[in-house]
Amino acid sequence: MQTVLFLAALVSLAAAGYPQYHYDVETRKLDPSLLNIQTKVLSLLENWKQVNPDDEYYKIGKEYNVEANMESYTNREVVTEFLSLYKAGFIPKNEVFSIFYENQALEVIALYRLFYYAKDFETFYKTAAFARVWLNEGQFVYAFYLAVIHRADTRGIVLPAPYEIWPEYFMNSDVLSKIYRIQMQKGLIIPEQGPYYGILSKDNAYYFYANYSGPLTYEDNENLLSYFIEDIGWNSYYYYFHNRFPFWENGEQLIGPLKERRGEIYYYVYQKILARYYLERLANGLGEIPRFNWLDKYQTSYYPLLSSYQLPFAQRNDDYYLASGDNINDIQFIDTYEKTFLQLLQKGQFKAYKQEVDLYNSKSINFVGNYWQSNADLYEKVPKRNYWRSYEATARRVLGAAPRSSINYENMNIPTALDFYQTSLRDPAFYQLYAKILDYINEYKEYLEPYSQDVLHYVGVKINDVKVDKLVTYFEYFDWNATNAVYLSEQQLDTVSPSYIVRQPRLNNKPFTVNIDIKSDVESEVVVKIFLGPKYDGNGLPISLEDNWINFIELDWFTHKLTSGQNKIARKSEEFFFFKDDSVSLFKIYELLSNGQVPSYMVDRYIYLPRRLILPRGTQRGFPLQLFVVVYPYQAPVKEWESMRQYIVDNKPFGYPFDRPVTLPYYFNQPNMYFKDVYVYQEGEQYPYYNSYWSQNQVSNH
């Protein structure tokens, strides 16, 4: 009987109806001058929770003295600030680190700036080795990852995917405990039992089959979305966004002249996240994103099965009363912040922090976005600001529902999903919070003049037809390396240790082509945009464009030269501007490096969404959506933005023409615009849970 169980488990794990993901890696030749830098960067991130006395970095970092090398940094002030904090005592090793914990954040920002202002890579490497040996592990990785992205001499360097660096933040604790068990036992004591527990062994690697969270974590059918909100690519996207635009750093340093659009970027990214999430809700029959009031009981519980390498994550009960206990002062601050914004809108003017802003101007979206993020550019003309007394940070703290620590380090902080950019998207409260923020920003947009027919109409250009291939989604298995979750023995550090691989089904879609038939009276260079939005709301009723403009997600943005007469454009989903392939594993990176190559999209397109998440999961009968295609004259980006062409195609606002409310829907029936009804079909299992009782008989309203 036991043998039958083992065989049944093996069959269900190895098959389960899902294909296996295969990489098709687009590579580029790595500049020979960067090869040594690339190798050293990767070496500092391997097994980062522990130090290896036999590694090069340890011997360098153990002896390096920052104070004795002050001349090796281009900004003496940041060295002085770092040393002041370092001598006072940084957070100890093995403590949970979050950028939302104030004292820890002040320290890690000082460390990042020390890295950033190292005069050359040799100094940067020595400083990083010092931090790797002596400082808190989480602070080191956070600051180092950021510095590699933003330093000029490390541009072109590939970094491992976030889920390979922090595996414990991307899988549930049941899988983590199995990995710990195998590491402690030094393998499977009875190999035949492995498949029964969801563990397979092959070629010095252990494969752990992982499920997504169920009703124990999410109530009210929210668990139907766990395959999406717990997707490692979805959560990595948000982490990359923070690394490209950390709220506490000045925009001039991060994005140069694009700083004047930082607040606009903030709005655009969160609109895209919420629009994509909303489509997935509709596909699962869950309806609208719930709204909440800070003074009422919060109804959305969350019981994460996550654990840091030291502490389990805090849980939030249903009927959680937000405005109670330690939250009273925070709720008052939040309430005042919201009311202040509405009062500013009524006045039409903001005058503070040594700046004056006309809130009825479309370019003021930059200020409005900065206001809600409370980032460094909002306060650039005034002395240093406490970013942890911001709306975002305070709201996360309240919704996280963690017990408050009375002592900064000794008592530690109980982590919540909202404390980390790697895990925030797993908590349904995240989407409800940012839906609230976007509601306020859209209040500002209501004061802007809607686009007129003259602005939207492109005279002489007509889209005759749009045809789309059959849209199909499915689940497939994907392997990712979780070895960084464990501590290796001294012997394993110096040998080829076993790899611990998590195997998990993920949403994907079949490649498709959008065929656009355009008639033009003249030869011209144009911009083509493709959007995807809902056809019906959560009740199965058609949505008017007045209510629906905010729900469209921009899929593609490209230029094209039209000739006089008929033009046919075939745009493949693999070409879509805002999407990329999944990150390859660290093993694959090393394999490519041996030939002097790196994955090109992990260098300059890491910030985009995985291509397999273009479409929401379909249904067997077809999930109805609408594609919107628009063509308009090309205006080149201003010269100052040339260095940011991987983010910008033309000179229009991000999300145009859905960057403003639609008050007259018939204005969007111009000849150069086209709405196309499409359906998304799901092949195979509707939910990635093998024989899951909890996901049976759940269908959308469409």
UniProtKB/Swiss-Prot annotation:
InterPro entries for the chain: Di-copper_centre_dom_sf, Hemocyanin/hexamerin, Hemocyanin/hexamerin_mid_dom, Hemocyanin_C, Hemocyanin_C_sf, Hemocyanin_N, Hemocyanin_N_sf, Ig_E-set
Key words, A-Z: Glycoprotein, Secreted, Signal, Storage protein
Signal peptide: 1-16
Predominant cellular place of this UniProt entry's protein: secreted
Keyword Nuclease set for record: no
Pfam families with a match to the protein in the record: Hemocyanin_C (PF03723), Hemocyanin_M (PF00372), Hemocyanin_N (PF03722)
Location of the protein in the cell: Secreted
GO MF, one annotated term: nutrient reservoir activity
Tissue-by-tissue expression: Hemolymph.
GO CC, any one term: extracellular region
PROSITE patterns reported in the protein's UniProt record: HEMOCYANIN_1, HEMOCYANIN_2
Source domain of life: Eukaryota
SUPFAM superfamilies: Di-copper centre-containing domain (SSF48056), E set domains (SSF81296), Hemocyanin, N-terminal domain (SSF48050)
Glycosylation sites: N211, N481
Function: Larval storage protein (LSP) which may serve as a store of amino acids for synthesis of adult proteins. Binds the A.niger cell wall component alpha-1,3-glucan, a fungal pathogen-associated molecular pattern (PAMP) that activates the host immune response.
Family under the similarity heading: Belongs to the hemocyanin family.
The protein's name: Arylphorin
Gene source species: Galleria mellonella (Greater wax moth)
